[in-house]
Regions:
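Conserved beta-propeller blade repeats
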Residues: 2-22, 60-80, 135-154
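Residue-level detector of intrinsically disordered/flexible regions characterized by low predicted structural confidence
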Residues: 16-17, 49-52, 122
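Generic "edge-of-domain/loop-turn" microfeature
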Residues: 17, 26, 38-41, 78, ...
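Asp-box/WD-like beta-propeller blade repeats and closely related beta-sheet repeat scaffolds
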Residues: 22-117, 126, 130-133
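Beta-propeller domains
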Residues: 130, 134-179
């Protein structure tokens, strides 16, 4: 089920027997959904087809929205929340450099800060919209398993950070440290 070229991450759906798959194809980052009922029926028959027999393209991430990283699927299977690295403005870059986490003097900088953010892809239409922008590197992202639109993610420094975990809502109206 997870074979094929350029496979990114795979997530099982919460509400149906499907699997969401990201693939980097040429210059595009694409999101697919795989019909696991059809796939496992063919496995049982001993006649498994090519991935295209089970996968449907949901959307292509626009390069203008940033460079996609990890993602998480909302508990209702309506949205994928995608971390991105982005260019940003000179003012944002200056603030990021000023506020970046610096390890103790005897520790190396493991991951340099970068301007990032979170975008969401509507898994019914493929539309991608901005959730938030951050002035630190966003790392691991998770969507609530119980409450639609709740997202938790980390400030990725390769180790410690002044504030490691963050919370936001899918509409961007809440963006705060998670204590």
């Amino acid at each position: 089920a997870t074979e094929g070229p350029d496979l990114g991450s795979a997530f099982l759906a919460n509400k149906s027997n499907r699997m969401f798959i990201s693939r980097k194809e040429k210059e595009d980052w694409n999101m697919y959904v795989m019909d696991l009922d059809k796939f496992f029926a063919d496995v049982k028959k001993g006649k498994v087809g090519k991935p295209t027999a089970y996968e449907t393209l949901l959307g292509t991430f626009p390069t203008s929205m940033g460079r996609p990283g990890g993602y998480a699927i909302d508990c209702n299977d309506d949205y994928a929340y995608i971390t991105v690295e982005r260019e940003g403005t000179e003012e944002e870059k200056e603030r990021m450099a000023k506020n970046a986490f610096l390890p103790e003097s005897n520790q190396p900088v493991k991951i340099k800060p970068s301007l990032c953010g979170i975008r969401k892809m509507n898994l019914a239409t493929g539309e991608v919209t901005k959730v938030i922008d951050t002035e630190f590197k966003t790392g691991h992202i998770q969507a609530s398993r119980f409450t639609p639109g709740e997202i938790v993610f980390c400030n990725e420094t390769g180790g410690d950070a002044y504030q490691r975990m963050w919370f936001c809502t899918a509409d961007g109206s809440v963006f705060k440290p998670l204590y």
